[in-house]
Structure formats: C-alpha cells, structure tokens
From Swiss-Prot:
This is Ketol-acid reductoisomerase (NADP(+)). One of its GO terms (cellular component) is cytosol. The lineage of its organism: Bacteria, Bacillati, Actinomycetota, Actinomycetes, Mycobacteriales. Gene3D superfamilies: 6.10.240.10, NAD(P)-binding Rossmann-like Domain. Involved in the biosynthesis of branched-chain amino acids (BCAA). Catalyzes an alkyl-migration followed by a ketol-acid reduction of (S)-2-acetolactate (S2AL) to yield (R)-2,3-dihydroxy-isovalerate. In the isomerase reaction, S2AL is rearranged via a Mg-dependent methyl migration to produce 3-hydroxy-3-methyl-2-ketobutyrate (HMKB). In the reductase reaction, this 2-ketoacid undergoes a metal-dependent reduction by NADPH to yield (R)-2,3-dihydroxy-isovalerate. Its cofactor is Mg(2+). It comes from Corynebacterium glutamicum (strain ATCC 13032 / DSM 20300 / JCM 1318 / BCRC 11384 / CCUG 27702 / LMG 3730 / NBRC 12168 / NCIMB 10025 / NRRL B-2784 / 534). Its EC number is 1.1.1.86.
Length: 338
C-alpha cells in the first residue's frame, strides 16, 4: 500500500498559529522546533526543569523560559521533547496537573504513549510530530526554505481536530515542504526501536567491532583494521543514503561488489534474520521497554556497565589516535548533538 504524502497545500498553518505552544526540552529537536515555530508566526515558550543548563541557550536565542509546570499551565499545545526515560515523570509531576480539556500533548517519539507509560485524560488531544532527521538539519533546512520529512500520528482526538493540528505543527517546522507521512504511534515506535537496535546502532556497532577483532586477532595492525571496518563505513553509508544499495554497488569497484555479494550472506544469514525477528518481538510485546524502565529505576546501572564495556574496546583507542591525524574530522563530534 502506497503511503500518503501531505504538503503545505494540505495544511492550515493558522491552526498552530492560533495556539500557545510550550516546547519541553531544548536539546537537538527542541531548539529546532522552537525556532522554526517562532519563524512561522507561532507563540512559543520553553519549559525546562529548574537549573537546566539549556536555559541560558534558550534565553540567548530570545525565548522566554519557564519551569515545565509553568509552561504547561500557560500553553494549550505542549510538545514533550525530553528524553524518553524522563517523560513519564515530567508528565505526572509537571504537565498532567496543568492540562485542560482540549489541550494538545504532542510527542516526537511514540514510546511512552504506545506502551502506556503516559496516559493522558480522554479529553486531551494526543499526537505526534516526528521529523526524520536530527535537530540541526531540521533547522538548517527550514532556514534554507526547505524541510525534513515528518511523520505524524494521532492517539486521542476528543475534538476531531487532532490530525489537522499535528499537520499544521509539522508544516510550521518545515516538514510539509518535504512531505508529511501520517502513521500510527505503534508503527513509529516499533520501527524506530527496531532500526536502532538491529541495524543502525546495535547491529552496525557489533559488525564493526567484530570485524576489527577478526583482523587484529589474525595479526593485522589495529590501524589497518580501523580504516577498513570503521573509517570507510561513512563512504559506503553515504552512497546508500544518496542513491540506495544499487548506487553503492555501482560506485564501488567490481572486486568490492563481487566480494560483497558472495560474503554478505555468510555474515548476515538466515539465523541472523531469525534473531532479528526475536528482537522485533521483544520490542512489540514490551519486553525491551520493561528492561529500559527497570534500568532507569535501578539508577542506570545496566546502561552504565554496558557503556563502560563498549567505550573500553580497543577500537576506541585506535580510532582516537587516527582521528587526530584527520583535519577534516571534528575534534568533538558529540558537540553536534549536545
């Protein structure tokens, strides 16, 4: 079934322009949403916890900063862009007591709604606007007169206006310039988590790490292994990003293409696909989310242990030394997402 694409001509920008919007969180997405909304003629305030380091950044950008509770009381549209694992607490303590019938609670990701970690009253509009790109790209494309495609979804629609309101919001941040795709909270949540775990983060990270180990354990220099399994990965991903897998295969050498066809299925085989299906099941039935919440309730001990183990892998030390030789690589790429 073909997806439905909506554009600026399908959106009524006046719907969001007639609302007071609180952006809760001023990170990668928060700064982009708030600035794009303001440039589209929407009244915006920023809601942050007391003592937040982001408050000064928001003020420097010209925004009024309130506590999250104050922002929720002031607004009739609240976009919750805080980290997934803190959203339920923020909702319970600061947002829920300040909601009125007909207010809209929006999300950039569906996890907390889909898995019932947040349960707004029935008279509250619940929707999602999820740009398919990082915040700095959402902002840069908007300034350039373009946009980043967005997903929108509706979970509760007591007024019959939720779809139009989420589309209006998406248009105000530039999404309808590129195309807005209506979906569901379930589809966005499950596919997003699966992509992160099985392919983008978990799968790719393990593939790179194990490839490095195979080469170094066979006696090859760590620097050579790093270049071949990690450094050149960007070239391949960029080619796929720009024109698909066929474009990548067209662009590499015949030797690389032929070897890839032969060896790829030996690495990612039917057993791998079966385990990926198991990962999908764990996401769908809530197993992963329960473990995520348990980790938070236990002070992030499991996450911190995993993080330390991965950060101490030999590929990290090798990579740090080699990146110092590359003037075109940012000294601290993490600053981009801070």
């Amino acid at each position: 079934m073909a997806i439905e694409l909506l554009y600026d001509a399908d959106a009524d920008l006046s719907l969001i322009q007639g609302r007071k919007v609180a952006i809760v969180g001023y990170g990668s997405q928060g700064h982009a949403h708030s600035q794009n909304l303001r440039d589209s003629g929407v009244e915006v305030v920023i809601g942050l916890r007391e003592g937040s380091k982001s408050a000064e950044k928001a003020k420097e950008a010209g925004f009024e900063v309130k506590t999250t509770a104050e922002a929720a009381a002031w607004a009739d549209v609240i976009m919750l862009l805080a980290p997934d694992t803190s959203q339920a607490e923020i909702f319970t303590n600061d947002i829920e007591p300040n909601l009125n019938a007909g207010d809209a609670l929006l999300f950039g990701h569906g996890l907390n709604i889909h898995f019932d970690l947040i349960k707004p009253a029935d008279d509250i509009i619940v929707g999602m606007v999820a740009p398919k790109g990082p915040g700095h790209l959402v902002r840069r494309q908007f300034v350039d007169g373009k946009g980043v495609p967005c997903l929108i979804a509706v979970d509760q629609d007591p007024t019959g206006t939720a779809q139009a309101l989420t589309l209006s919001y998406a248009a105000a941040i530039g999404g309808a310039r590129a195309g807005v795709i209506p979906t569901t909270f379930e589809a966005e949540t499950v596919t997003d988590l699966f992509g992160e775990q099985a392919v983008l983060c978990g799968g790719t990270e393990e593939l790179v790490k194990v490839g490095f180990e195979v080469l170094t354990e066979a006696g090859y220099e760590p620097e050579m292994a790093y270049f071949e399994v990690l450094h050149e990965l960007k070239l391949i991903v960029d080619l796929m990003f720009e024109g698909g897998i066929s474009n990548m295969n067209y662009s590499v050498s015949d030797t690389a293409e032929f070897g890839g066809y032969l060896s790829g299925p030996r690495v990612i085989d039917a057993d791998t696909k079966s385990r990926m299906k198991d990962i999908l099941t764990d996401i769908q039935d809530g197993t992963f989310t329960k473990r995520l919440i348990a980790n938070v309730e236990n002070g992030n001990t499991e996450l911190e242990g995993l993080r330390a183990s991965y950060n101490n892998h030999p590929i990290e030390e090798t990579g740090a030394k080699l990146r110092d030789l590359m003037s075109w690589v940012k000294v601290d790429a993490r600053a981009e997402t801070a």
